[in-house]
């Protein structure tokens, strides 16, 4: 029964990830695409956690942390690009 619930949850997460990919492709504005990319990162973390529970292993926990860090850095970089038009500033006024 528990395995069935995990498989259903994996299916739901896969469908929502697919819908977010459509939002990234068709998104009317760039901020919509950024939010969809962030949600894809969160879904990947959840899918990895569900697979880890399903396989009864803790081997994927490092991958979950890595995906979380990369998703956070990507969101910050996109936000900075939307705000200033560049990610890394060459001219800094000190």
From Swiss-Prot:
GO terms for molecular function: sodium:proton antiporter activity. Coiled coil: none annotated. GO terms for cellular component: plasma membrane. Pfam families: MrpF_PhaF. GO terms for biological process: sodium ion export across plasma membrane. Signal peptide: none annotated. It is a multi-pass membrane protein. The keyword Membrane applies. Keywords: Antiport, Cell membrane, Hydrogen ion transport, Ion transport, Membrane, Sodium, Sodium transport, Transmembrane, Transmembrane helix, Transport. The keyword Cell membrane applies. InterPro entries: MrpF/PhaF-like. It comes from the Bacteria. Its main location: membrane. It is found in: Cell membrane. The chain crosses the membrane at residues 2-22, 34-54, 59-79. Mrp complex is a Na(+)/H(+) antiporter that is considered to be the major Na(+) excretion system in B.subtilis. Has a major role in Na(+) resistance and a minor role in Na(+)- and K(+)-dependent pH homeostasis as compared to TetB. MrpA may be the actual Na(+)/H(+) antiporter, although the six other Mrp proteins are all required for Na(+)/H(+) antiport activity and Na(+) resistance. MrpA is required for initiation of sporulation when external Na(+) concentration increases. Also transports Li(+) but not K(+), Ca(2+) or Mg(2+). Involved in cholate and Na(+) efflux activities, which may be mechanistically coupled. Does not require other Mrp proteins for its own function. Mrp-dependent antiport apparently occurs by a secondary, proton motive force-dependent mechanism, but the similarity of several Mrp proteins to membrane-embedded subunits of energy-coupled NADH dehydrogenase complexes raises the possibility that there is a capacity for electron transport that could provide a primary energy coupling option for Mrp functions. Belongs to the CPA3 antiporters (TC 2.A.63) subunit F family. Forms a heterooligomeric complex that consists of seven subunits: MrpA, MrpB, MrpC, MrpD, MrpE, MrpF and MrpG. PANTHER family: NA(+)/H(+) ANTIPORTER SUBUNIT F1, NA(+)_H(+) ANTIPORTER SUBUNIT F. This is Na(+)/H(+) antiporter subunit F. It comes from Bacillus subtilis (strain 168). The gene is mrpF.
């Amino acid at each position: 029964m528990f395995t069935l619930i995990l498989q259903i949850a994996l299916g739901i997460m896969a469908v929502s990830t697919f819908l977010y990919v459509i939002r990234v492709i068709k998104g009317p504005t760039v901020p919509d695409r950024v939010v969809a990319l962030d949600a894809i990162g969160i879904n990947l973390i959840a899918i990895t956690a569900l697979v880890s529970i399903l396989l009864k292993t803790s081997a994927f926990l490092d991958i979950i942390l890595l995906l979380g860090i990369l998703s956070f850095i990507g969101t910050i970089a996109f936000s900075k690009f939307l705000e200033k038009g560049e990610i890394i500033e060459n001219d800094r006024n000190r």
